[in-house]
């Protein structure tokens, strides 16, 4: 538990016991020995740590500034290598079955809800924009005008939610995941860990690397996954998708959308 505090904060007692290779009764006994009335009370400090963990952007920024003063070429080389690694990991053979299954879930959905807040809004918007060019059943969730809860109204078992989220996880994102799960929607999570709260109820989790030598985490891996999902969805879309794209192109041409 000391070595894997995130798992304790996010998972049930049965799951923690399974991962530790012990029976649930062992965790129950440990809970009482430590003076907690029940497992939820033992788990609360671990959950609190997850909620209050600081992203430490300021200290990382200072570190980058110190590096750049001494060796900008080395910093750029490290950045390039890390971004390449992020993409390679995200588009790995291990991730492909999860991406293909996730695309099938969304292809079979009545409605596809798309969610990414704060920094994760960019890959979420890219997915929504590309997807709506050949399908008409996408709903991009956001917090504008306080309409977040309204946008989720009606989500159910015939729908899916694509959620993109990385530590530090936005509270509205986790709330939406929990709501969608309770409503029976199928969740596809693009996130940084299999124990991410965004993946707690996911049918499929696509883990992407987001490390960066810069002060802010990278979304290059998430963008690569979005591109892969869109490509897979196009292959599953059928002939109607071509007609929808043709109509979209005509409409954009009529309003002179492009220079």
Where are the language model's segments positioned?
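Amphipathic alpha-helical interaction segments
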Residues: 15, 41, 101-104, 122, ...
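Glycine-rich phosphate-binding loops that contact phosphosugars or nucleotide phosphates
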Residues: 104-224, 228-237
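HTH-adjacent hinge/linker in prokaryotic transcriptional regulators
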Residues: 3-10, 14-98
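A short, charged, Gly/Pro-tolerant segment at domain boundaries
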Residues: 239-259
């Amino acid at each position: 538990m000391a070595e894997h505090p995130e798992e304790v904060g996010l998972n049930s007692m049965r799951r923690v016991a399974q991962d530790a290779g012990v029976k649930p009764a062992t965790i129950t006994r440990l809970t009482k020995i430590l003076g907690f009335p029940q497992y939820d009370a033992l788990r609360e400090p671990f959950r609190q740590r997850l909620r209050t963990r600081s992203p430490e952007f300021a200290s990382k920024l200072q570190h980058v500034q110190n590096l750049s003063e001494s060796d900008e070429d080395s910093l750029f080389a490290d950045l390039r290598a890390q971004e390449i690694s992020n993409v390679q990991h995200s588009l790995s053979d291990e991730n492909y079955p999860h991406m293909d299954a996730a695309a099938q879930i969304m292809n079979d959905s009545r409605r596809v809800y798309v969610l990414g807040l704060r920094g994760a809004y960019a890959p979420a918007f890219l997915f929504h924009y590309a997807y709506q060019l050949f399908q008409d059943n996408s709903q991009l969730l956001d917090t504008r005008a306080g309409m977040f809860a309204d946008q989720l109204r009606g989500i159910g078992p015939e729908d899916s939610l694509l959620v993109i989220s990385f530590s530090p996880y936005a509270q509205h994102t986790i709330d939406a995941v929990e709501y969608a799960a309770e409503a029976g929607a199928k969740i596809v999570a693009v996130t940084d860990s299999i124990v991410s709260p965004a993946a707690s109820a996911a049918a499929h989790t696509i883990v992407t690397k987001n490390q960066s030598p810069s002060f802010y985490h990278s979304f290059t891996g998430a963008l690569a996954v979005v591109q892969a999902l869109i490509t897979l969805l196009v292959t599953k879309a059928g002939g109607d998708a071509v007609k929808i794209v043709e109509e979209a192109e005509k409409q954009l041409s009529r309003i002179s959308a492009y220079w």
